[in-house]
């Protein structure tokens, strides 16, 4: 039955192109135009960036040449003692030691994270310290301040934060820390020990990051019991951190010192916002 159907002499339909010569010509022109458009470098992504760069004479070009990998394993530490009635400035250490040097050169860096620990050793001092991270690249003194913290010198506290913008390595001398002390209750003595930790991130694609809030922690006094036994120091660091992390804050008041002053994080890292054009401005330009 099936074989007879296969061998049947029924007529089959012949497939043919029903386009006329003019229609075929229009189709060919359209195809040639589409092909020409696809080869244009400024055609909204129809050509890859590498191909467009080649057409523009920028060869060799490839995104693989841009090392967007970040080198963020370097942590620097700086340790200073602060004396009364002093105003000091020091550069932030952004260069790793020779055994931490990356194999690839990254021309830009930023402080991806920082931690500052202030240990006040004059418990009855009534002075105030002002700590600033500044970028001397800016002309205006107010624009230079990235982070500003104001707090009593008798307290033990820590500051945690990060900077959003990258700097060129050749401008590293512009990134500094300013420490000023305003106190008339002590003199001719060291009032605190400060520890600075910097997490340095390097790249060659310096796109700024989102800003994070700078926060503070105040350390509570440790219990002084069984101090003559070495076992009491086994969890010293853990105890300090646990007591500090319990109360993060950005501002705090001390009426007994000065009710008019603001204590804590006075200035946060920020960027100039991108302003959008109004509809009227857009219509005028159009």
From Swiss-Prot:
Family named by the database record: Belongs to the tenuiviruses pc4 protein family.
Any one biological process term the GO annotation gives: transport of virus in host, cell to cell
Entry GO MF terms: RNA binding
Lineage: Viruses, Riboviria, Orthornavirae, Negarnaviricota, Polyploviricotina
Keywords: RNA-binding, Transport, Viral movement protein
Record carries keyword Transport: yes
Pfam families, A to Z: Tenui_NS4
Protein name, entry field: Movement protein
Protein role: Transports viral genome to neighboring plant cells directly through plasmosdesmata, without any budding. The movement protein allows efficient cell to cell propagation, by bypassing the host cell wall barrier.
Xref: InterPro entries: Tenui_NS4
């Amino acid at each position: 039955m099936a074989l007879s159907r296969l061998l049947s002499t029924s007529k089959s339909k012949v497939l043919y192109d029903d386009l006329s010569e003019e229609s075929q010509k229009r189709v060919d022109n359209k195809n040639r135009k589409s092909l020409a458009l696809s080869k244009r470098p400024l055609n909204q992504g129809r050509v890859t960036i590498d191909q467009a760069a080649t057409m523009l004479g920028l060869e060799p070009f490839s995104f693989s040449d841009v090392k967007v990998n970040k080198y963020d394993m370097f942590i620097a530490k700086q340790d200073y003692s602060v004396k009364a009635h002093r105003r000091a400035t020091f550069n932030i250490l952004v260069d790793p030691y020779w055994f931490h040097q990356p194999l690839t050169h990254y021309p830009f860096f930023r402080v991806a994270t920082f931690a500052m620990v202030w240990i006040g050793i004059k418990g009855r001092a009534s002075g105030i310290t002002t700590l600033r991270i500044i970028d001397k690249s800016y002309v205006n003194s107010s624009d230079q301040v990235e982070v500003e913290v104001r707090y009593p010198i008798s307290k033990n506290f820590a500051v945690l934060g990060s900077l959003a913008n990258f700097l060129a390595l050749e401008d590293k001398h512009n990134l500094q820390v300013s420490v000023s002390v305003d106190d008339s209750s002590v003199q001719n003595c060291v009032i605190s020990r400060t520890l600075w930790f910097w997490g340095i991130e390097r790249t060659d694609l310096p796109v700024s990051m989102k800003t994070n809030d700078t926060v503070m922690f105040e350390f509570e006094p440790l219990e002084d019991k069984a101090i003559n036994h070495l076992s009491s120091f086994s969890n010293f660091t853990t105890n300090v951190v646990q007591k500090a992390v319990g109360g993060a804050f950005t501002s705090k008041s001390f009426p007994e010192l000065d009710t008019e002053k603001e204590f804590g994080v006075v200035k946060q890292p920020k960027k100039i916002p991108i302003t959008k054009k109004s509809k009227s401005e857009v219509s005028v330009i159009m």
